[in-house]
């Protein structure tokens, strides 16, 4: 089974934060999860709120566990709130259904994991995360 290496996870984090600085975003927090939803790498920039790890992880966790992007999860939550409520019941409240959760795929389309970015608007979080994933030579789906 293909996976995100620790080196690639660190690259994703580093390049996501660099993109955030380039875009002049608020301080970001970034987590990279493997295909089982386990953290591989996390960083919280100076000035980011201490609770941002759980938000970043929740964005990524929903993506990897359901095979959906953060945008798709948001849309599903708006259309069928009962679905996301049920999912959060099943996953102990760990799913945050908003953009900034990004599926990570290899070139064959296999899901390798997910990235969660938080700190600015959800759309800006997603843009920064996509840049980090691309810099690691992987494919992001926000």
Identify what each model region corresponds to:
Residues 1-142:
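Flexible, solvent-exposed loop/hinge segments and secondary-structure transition points
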């Amino acid at each position: 089974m293909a996976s995100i290496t620790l080196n690639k996870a660190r690259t994703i984090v580093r390049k996501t934060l660099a993109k955030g600085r380039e875009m002049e975003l608020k301080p970001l927090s970034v987590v990279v999860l493997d295909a089982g939803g386990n953290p591989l790498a996390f960083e919280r920039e100076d000035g980011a709120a201490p609770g941002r790890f759980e938000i970043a992880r929740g964005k990524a966790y929903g993506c990897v566990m359901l095979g959906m992007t953060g945008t798709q999860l948001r849309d599903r939550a708006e259309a069928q709130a009962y679905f996301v409520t049920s999912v959060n019941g099943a996953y102990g409240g760990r799913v945050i259904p908003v953009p900034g959760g990004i599926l990570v795929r290899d070139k064959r389309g296999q899901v390798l994991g997910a990235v969660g970015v938080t700190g600015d608007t959800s759309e800006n979080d997603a843009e920064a995360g996509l840049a980090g994933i691309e810099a690691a030579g992987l494919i992001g789906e926000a």
